[in-house]
Structure formats: C-alpha cells, structure tokens
Amino acid sequence: MRAALIYGGDDKKLELFAKKIFSAIGRKGNELKVIKVGRGINAGNLSPYEFIFVGCPVLSVFKGKLPSELIDYIKRCTGMERKKTIAFIISRLMGNDKTLKNLMSLLESKGSFIVDFKQIRDLDKDSELLASRIKY
C-alpha cells in the first residue's frame, strides 16, 4: 500500500519520528513517501496514495498554532478528497488538544477522512502503532 507522510515545523523529535515511522511502514511491506514542507516545496497531487499521515509540533500553548508552511502546503495540495488520513502532533506539556483539533480541521477542510489521530509521546511505540493502522 502507498502512503504519504507530510510534516512541517522545525523539531528534532518530529524529524526522528518521521524516520521511525518510515522504517515501521517499510517493515510491513508498504511504501511511504516522506514530504517535509518548507519554503520552495511545491504542493503535489496526493491521489496515488491510499493513506496520508500529517503531523507537526505544538508551537503555542493556548492558540493551537500550526506551522504556516504546513498550512500553505495542505491548502495547495490536490487529491486529498476522501483520503484516509491520520493526524499527529509531537506533544508538549500544554497546547496539545488545540493543535491537534486545528490540524484535523485543516485536513477535513480539504475533504480528508480522519481515521485516527495521536499525540506522540513515545516515538518507538507510537510509530509502530500508527504504522499498524494502514489496512487494505
């Protein structure tokens, strides 16, 4: 099965999580395309993918602010309609619920179907857990 991982924001734990979930999905015989959004990254067509993972770090305690480059990328993407999507954040002490809610709202505004969401606390355990959510 083909999946895409889209993530934005400068966070070392997020980078490490992307590597761990890439390995976990590969071990299960699935293909994962990793897309780190940033300046100069063109939004693509996500139609070829059956599953889409989207994640970011928590940037603010109260407002649930998302990385601007992630918002811009998702808004410009095509092919997200009716896609099975998993939203995740790299959790902090505070601000987790609001950030996750805002991320899911952004994805749903593009027509994605959220099948799971997760606040990432244990990189190893949570990468295996989310990788196991890919089902035919």
Task: Please provide the spans of the model-predicted regions.
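FMN-binding flavodoxin-like domain, especially the glycine-rich phosphate-binding loop
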Residues: 3-9, 13-37, 44-136
